[in-house]
């Protein structure tokens, strides 16, 4: 068995490539089922965000598992395998586990220490459980990664003052426009990113904001969180009119197709002299061809790196402290993973002990007689189980805790030989 992650991120692929592989939440269950149908894939979890798509696997064969996951990505994106390989990264076992911990802690994010990734990993874990992709191994890994992510944020200052994708977009808009208070600003979408956009715009003393959304009811829920602000709500069908009266538009919906297209722009009769579109969605909400219009400037998540770099230098120092904590967490994982090697031997030892206990108990009961048994059977059962458990407890604890691979391996072989455990198969022992 091996733990593998196959994926791509903002570090390995541009947004136009990432969006082709993005898996929306509504498709995660289907994707997990497809992956689990491959013969060498035992467990699956899928992490899909605007900056990464990562498939975490437990496989019975490392090479075949990688091949199957890569083939799945090619089939689901209509990309060729050579195209994919240019941008994919593959990590095995300890490297895969450490990568998940770094991702969850915000150390691998475009913005070091950003908080949203922790909730995204939690959702990945929940969906993996819901659609039965996560088994005992990935369950332990994700629980430990989430715990590590929380610990890093609690014990270091990595998330103090960290910017988010939304706040970085607002900062970039301010750099380009200088004074946002005089701009007509529209937000397309009413989800979490839109809420953060409103929050950061208000911190820049922006007074008037337009929210355009397919569901007006959902937009109202967003507006209700900012009662002090002057926020106007519009249906998506009114987007053309709103664009004609906007200087800046932020987009952050979960739409799988572009919403602002060249056709929509051509239908607008009277656009402002300069319209800036800040698209922080993946897949993108703004068709890349919209940038061909002279009076329109389009920015996407990859353009935020300019803003982020100003924030990163001080955060890298904090990241070093976080890395030390993650090394401790990885050591704890290695102890757990090593203990799995002992489980088959421990189970056989327990099974043999139980066979002996039951057989000897039956002999004792036949000698003691029915009257004694009816009055004391529970006590005798408890006594014999207690003796077996006490005898087995120390060797089992020592086997699980042994970190030295060679010592543990020798101990397992000695145990198997001394107790003749190779004869224990399917609960039967031919020698008894």
From Swiss-Prot:
PROSITE patterns found in the cross-reference section: GLUTR
Location within or outside the cell: Plastid, Cyanelle
Domain of life of the native organism: Eukaryota
Pathway: Porphyrin-containing compound metabolism; protoporphyrin-IX biosynthesis; 5-aminolevulinate from L-glutamyl-tRNA(Glu): step 1/2; Porphyrin-containing compound metabolism; chlorophyll biosynthesis
Gene3D superfamilies, A to Z: Glutamyl-tRNA reductase, N-terminal domain, NAD(P)-binding Rossmann-like Domain
GO molecular function: glutamyl-tRNA reductase activity; NADP binding
Subunit note: Homodimer.
Domain notes: Possesses an unusual extended V-shaped dimeric structure with each monomer consisting of three distinct domains arranged along a curved 'spinal' alpha-helix. The N-terminal catalytic domain specifically recognizes the glutamate moiety of the substrate. The second domain is the NADPH-binding domain, and the third C-terminal domain is responsible for dimerization.
UniProt family annotation: Belongs to the glutamyl-tRNA reductase family.
Function (record text): Catalyzes the NADPH-dependent reduction of glutamyl-tRNA(Glu) to glutamate 1-semialdehyde (GSA).
Name this polypeptide is given: Glutamyl-tRNA reductase
Organism annotation: Cyanophora paradoxa
Gene: hemA
